[in-house]
């Protein structure tokens, strides 16, 4: 179902949600951190979703073991490098990796700006080694509150030239976007693109707020948009992209089943929706699974899957010339 003549992208992919189980085991042993299991086979149920979680917050706890072993900046650099290696193995030409430096720093009180620098270094080295093109999106973890998000923002702005966009993720219901208006004003002043997790746990009003008040050019997940016809029209007319993550939305109980997922409706409505993974290691999936298994199960035709692939590059945070160069590179391969 993947069109090999077109660039394959993943523009909603959490770097700190894609820490390999083997790496968690390795780092746990290296730093003498007590893990819930001592073999790869027995560790996986603790770090990977093996059945549907009751809600988004429950799903997010599966990410915690990955960051609990980040006891040094070198460990952060390693997982960033491995994220690019994983992207290359999946056949991705372009990936936007998003990460929350405060979340990665928290367990071992690492310097947040140091985490940002380590991630930048690891991703750069990975891109040079594996030939994948990547951009970084900084996340503010709303769950930890406004002050913690300000610390994350300051650390990200210290490396503003290496960061492409700002995102807001975490507990959407408990920490609405209205708490973070000044944060996003600063991000836009820095020249960054804006994407926001919205309409995943909360309703269409969260998406409207992300667009109108935070300046979102893309929406992460956005599944509740289908509940508001005016919003659907607005998304299509204004070319505001939706970063769809099929398997993730089932695992978080955001959507009841793949057959109920709104991605097909988005595409039929002319919304620029794309296919992405979200947290591949935690979910136990990759981009190939999303195209070959999840998308057909969600009712997408072959042409709709191809359109979603096209949309992934269309709404990527790249210039027109960068997109053109990537298309030409893939076409010539």
From Swiss-Prot:
Cofactor binding note: Binds 1 zinc ion per subunit.
Site residues by UniProt (Important for catalytic activity): 221
EC number: 3.5.4.4
Keywords from the named record: Hydrolase, Metal-binding, Nucleotide metabolism, Zinc
One cellular component (GO) term of this entry: cytosol
Catalytic reactions of this protein: adenosine + H2O + H(+) = inosine + NH4(+); 2'-deoxyadenosine + H2O + H(+) = 2'-deoxyinosine + NH4(+)
Binding-site residues, Zn(2+): 12, 14, 197, 278
Keyword Metal-binding: yes
Biological role: Catalyzes the hydrolytic deamination of adenosine and 2-deoxyadenosine.
Recorded family membership: Belongs to the metallo-dependent hydrolases superfamily. Adenosine and AMP deaminases family. Adenosine deaminase subfamily.
Protein name: Adenosine deaminase
Gene behind this protein: add
């Amino acid at each position: 179902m993947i069109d090999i003549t077109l660039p394959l992208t993943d523009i909603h992919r959490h770097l700190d949600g894609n820490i390999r189980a083997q790496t968690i085991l390795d780092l746990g042993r290296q730093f003498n951190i007590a893990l819930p299991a001592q073999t790869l086979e027995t560790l996986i149920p603790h770090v990977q979703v093996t059945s549907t979680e009751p809600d988004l917050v429950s799903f997010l706890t599966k990410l915690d073991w990955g960051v609990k072993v980040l006891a040094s900046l070198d460990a952060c650099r390693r997982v960033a490098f491995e994220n690019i290696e994983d992207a290359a193995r999946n056949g991705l030409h372009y990936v936007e990796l998003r990460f929350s430096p405060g979340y990665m720093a928290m367990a071992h009180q690492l310097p947040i700006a140091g985490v940002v620098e380590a991630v930048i270094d690891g991703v750069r080295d990975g891109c040079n080694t594996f030939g994948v093109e990547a951009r970084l999106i900084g996340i503010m973890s709303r769950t930890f509150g406004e002050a913690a998000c300000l610390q994350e923002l300051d650390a990200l702005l210290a490396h503003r030239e290496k960061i492409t966009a700002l995102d807001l993720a975490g507990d959407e219901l408990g920490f609405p976007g209205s708490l973070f208006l000044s944060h996003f004003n600063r991000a836009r002043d820095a020249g960054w693109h804006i994407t926001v997790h919205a309409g995943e746990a909360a309703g269409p009003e969260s998406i409207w707020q992300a667009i109108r008040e935070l300046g979102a050019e893309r929406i992460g997940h956005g599944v509740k948009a289908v509940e508001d016809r005016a919003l659907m029209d607005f998304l299509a007319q204004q070319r505001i992209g939706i970063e769809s993550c099929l398997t993730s939305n089932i695992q978080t109980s955001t959507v009841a089943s793949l057959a109920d997922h709104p991605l097909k409706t988005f595409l039929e409505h002319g919304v620029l929706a794309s296919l992405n993974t979200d947290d591949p290691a935690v979910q136990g999936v990759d981009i190939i699974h999303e195209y070959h298994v999840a998308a057909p199960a969600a009712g997408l035709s072959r042409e709709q899957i191809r359109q979603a692939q096209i949309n992934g590059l269309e709404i990527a945070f790249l210039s027109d010339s960068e997109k053109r160069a990537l298309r030409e590179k893939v076409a010539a391969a």
